[in-house]
Amino acid sequence: FKKLNMCMYIIMGLLLLLAILLMVTSCRSNALEEENEYDVSMMHTVGVSDVIDMFANEGTYVLYIGRETCSVCHDLLPALQEAQIKNNYITQYLDITQVDRSSSDWETLVGLLDVETTTTMDEEGETEEVTNTFGYFLDTKGFTPCVIIISGGEQIAGFFGSRSLTNFEDWLANYGI
C-alpha cells in the first residue's frame, strides 16, 4: 500500500505540474495575441479615390497599404505608429482587402504609382530580381506592406516590406518628413 500511495502522490504531482504549465503557456499565448493586435485606429483610413485625390493636391502624404492578415504588416505597424507620433503626421491607410481591384479608380491609381522598384521574387524555389513599378507589384502580386510618400502630386518614394523604427525614421527624414 505504501508503494501505491507513493505512486498516487507522484501522479497527482505530475498532473498538477502539467496543469500549471498549461495555464502559463495559455497566458503567454494570450499576451502575444494582444501584443500583435493590428490596430490602425491612429491612422486615417482612406479609399482608392481618396488616394487619387492626394495626387491632385500639393500636400505631402505618407500612405501605408496593408492588410490585417499580413504578418509583415504586423511587424511594420509599431514603427509606423511610433514614427507618426514622433514626427507629428497622420498616416493614410489603405486596406488592400477592401479595394475593388477591377475598378477604374484602381486602374488609375496603379498608373499613378509609377516609381520603379526592384524586389526579389521567389516562385517555386526560383528567385529572381524583378524591376517594375509600385503599381505593378500592388496590382499583379498584391504585395504588402507598402509605404509610399506622395508629395506635390506625385509619388516620390516608397518601399515594400518591414523596417525598424530607426530605419523608417531615417527614410522619412530623407524626404523631409
Which residues fall in each region the model found?
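Extracytoplasmic/periplasmic, Sec-exported soluble proteins
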Residues: 43, 68-75, 139, 160
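Local sequence-structure signature of Cys/Sec-based thiol-disulfide redox active-site neighborhoods
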Residues: 52-94
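Solvent-exposed loop/turn segments at secondary-structure junctions
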Residues: 68-72, 97-100, 154-156, 163-165
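Thiol-based oxidoreductase modules, predominantly thioredoxin-like and allied folds used
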Residues: 88-128
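Extended, charge-rich low-complexity interaction segments
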Residues: 116-152
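Non-catalytic, surface beta->alpha helical segment in thiol-disulfide oxidoreductase systems
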Residues: 138-177
